[in-house]
Each structure stands twice: as structure tokens, then as C-alpha cells.
Amino acid sequence: MSFSSAQESHQHSLETLELFYSHPDFMESVDSVCDIGCGKEAFDLEWWATQEVDDDDVISPLNIKCTGIDIHNMILVNHDNITYKQHDFETLLDQEFDVLWCHDSFQYALSPMLALSNYYHMLTDGGMLALIVPSTTNLEYNKLAFSQPNFHYYNHTLDGLIHMLSISGFDCESGFFQQQLNDRWIKLIVYKSDVEPMDPKTTTWYDLVETGLLPVSGVESINKYGYMKREDLVLTWLDYSNIWYGQ
């Protein structure tokens, strides 16, 4: 875990979860959620399980069916809407969900491409994957700072994750992305497309352009240089702010 406590981790999650809550139509469309790497305290999972909707001043529970998976033998949350499965979060779980919530856990995947392919198959058609991943290369006090935490074997970047997600069949053209300057957290919200995961050994940038899965600014960069440059990216976040990553 990248935080000093589970509560601190949950507070960080709420920055994104509360943006979801500000879109009631989206929340009401969600029937099932899987929290990948939910942790023993499972605060994020409990958040999903206890959400309510205000319909003409009548408060009603959404009753989202929630599944948590992690390597622990138990979690500390007990709720009728929550099911827990002891399971590693790289291999395929034989169940489909509307939302996969993956906060501060994907960085531990030993085979990230395989994990993303499995996540694709764990989603319902058009389902949403939310990845929130720490970067190990960051700007601190106008200098590059490098870190290598325990069990982090990949240096994930925003553009690298978009590359992997699109190869894995996720729609990044319609996705939402954020990595603020001086913020080590990369946030990606993408959707399962009707394009099956492709072979990462043979799929080129131009192949990805043909699928329509890449952000428009990424396609423009590829058409200009033959590959995607981070400084060309202009991406939208959940609050509909546009961020240029060339600054």
C-alpha cells in the first residue's frame, strides 16, 4: 500500500469516487462492482455498497452488488451487498461486473498486460475500468525523483498505460485521464470496447489508430511522428477539464 493507513488510502479514493457520485445517472446504471485489491478494511468497497439515490426527495439505496478480491483470508466489513473472494488480482475471475475499481493495486501486477486482458473479460459490455496507479518517476522541487518501492517492478506512465489499455481492448478515446503536475498519481477511467484484446507482440501504433481506441490527440501525434508523444496529449478528466501534458 502506498499510504500510511487504509483510511488515508480511502480519502485519496474519494477524490475520484465523489466525482462518480456527482453523476447520478451513472451511479444508477451500476448494478455490480468489483474492487480489485480491496484490502482488509475494504473502505472503498463499503462506499460502493452503501450508496443511495435521492429521487424527488426520497432517499433509496442503490443496492449495488459488490465483490472484493485480495490476497487476505478475510475482510473487516460485513454488509449484505458485499461478497469477498480470496483471489490474486492478476488472474481471471469467472464473473462479470459493470465496474472494476482498481485503486493503488495495479502496480503490483507481475504481468500487467495479462492482468488487463483478464480485466477486459471480467467486464460487462461497455463496462468501466478505473485504474489509479502511482508513478515511480516524478517531478519534485523541479527535479526528477526516482523511487523503487517494494514489489513495484514496472515504472508506469500515463502514456504507457494508455498504450497497454488500448491494446487490451479498452476505449481510451472516450476515456478520462488525469495526472497533475507534481502529483505522482495516474488516474485512468476507460471502457470495455467491442475490440478484443490484441497481441502486444505484433500490434503497432498504426494498428491501434485503426481500432479507434486511442485519444484523438494521441492519434494526431502518431500520424505526425509514428508513435505517441506524451507532450502532444490533451486529455479530459471526469470534471470535464482538459489537461495538456506538454507543459
Residue spans of the language-model regions?
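Short hydrophobic/aromatic beta-strand or adjacent loop that forms the aromatic wall/cage
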Residues: 183-189
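A conserved beta-strand element that flanks and buttresses the S-adenosyl-L-methionine
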Residues: 101
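Short, glycine-/aromatic-enriched active-site segment of Class I SAM-dependent methyltransferases
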Residues: 131-153
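Conserved N-terminal segment of class I S-adenosyl-L-methionine
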Residues: 1-92, 202-247
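Conserved S-adenosyl-L-methionine
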Residues: 170-181
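A short glycine-rich, Lys/Arg-flanked "PGG" loop and its adjoining helix->strand segment in the class I
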Residues: 113-128
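Short catalytic micro-motifs in class I SAM-dependent methyltransferases
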Residues: 104-107
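Short alpha-helix
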Residues: 153-168
